[in-house]
């Protein structure tokens, strides 16, 4: 990820954070915050489904730009969810950086070992 990409995510997160106490009649994001986390989570589920459908369309010759648009919608709503739980894109980026260089198999084994240790096993 380039610095400008990270900056874009952080700027967008700042705008989203600023909508937390906003008027739900004036802002879509404020409306989502006002409705609570279940509304945000439902929207993420809808957007994730739309990503899957758009990807299947691309596989069949559909427009890749439609997939990009759906992923943008999903990422946006994930940013709203992160903000709702007082998290930021920086938290996700840090986790991705932590995992970088680990194979998926190694990462999963490490996670299982940590879970066992946390549960006294």
UniProtKB/Swiss-Prot annotation:
Primary subcellular site in the record, as a coarse category: cytoplasm
Reactions performed catalytically: 1-(5-phospho-beta-D-ribosyl)-ATP + H2O = 1-(5-phospho-beta-D-ribosyl)-5'-AMP + diphosphate + H(+)
This protein's UniProt keywords: Amino-acid biosynthesis, ATP-binding, Cytoplasm, Histidine biosynthesis, Hydrolase, Nucleotide-binding
Protein name: Phosphoribosyl-ATP pyrophosphatase
GO BP terms: L-histidine biosynthetic process
Annotated EC: 3.6.1.31
Entry superkingdom: Bacteria
Keyword Heme: no
Designated gene of the protein: hisE
Intracellular or extracellular location(s): Cytoplasm
GO MF, any single term: phosphoribosyl-ATP diphosphatase activity
GO cellular component terms attached to this protein's record: cytoplasm
The keyword Amino-acid biosynthesis belongs to this UniProt entry's keyword annotation: yes
Top EC group: hydrolase
Family: Belongs to the PRA-PH family.
Transmembrane stretches, start-end: none
Pathway the protein contributes to: Amino-acid biosynthesis; L-histidine biosynthesis; L-histidine from 5-phospho-alpha-D-ribose 1-diphosphate: step 2/9
């Amino acid at each position: 990820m380039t610095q400008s990409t990270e900056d874009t995510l952080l700027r967008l997160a700042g705008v989203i954070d600023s909508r937390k106490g906003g008027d739900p009649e004036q802002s879509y994001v404020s409306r989502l915050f006002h409705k609570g986390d279940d509304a945000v989570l439902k929207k993420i589920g809808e957007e994730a489904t739309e990503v899957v459908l758009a990807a299947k369309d691309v596989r069949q010759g559909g427009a890749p730009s439609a997939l990009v648009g759906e992923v943008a919608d999903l990422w946006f709503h994930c940013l709203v969810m992160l903000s709702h739980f007082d998290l930021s894109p920086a938290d996700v980026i840090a986790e991705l950086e932590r995992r970088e260089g680990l194979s998926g198999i190694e990462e999963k084994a490490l996670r299982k070992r940590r879970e066992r240790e946390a549960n006294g096993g």
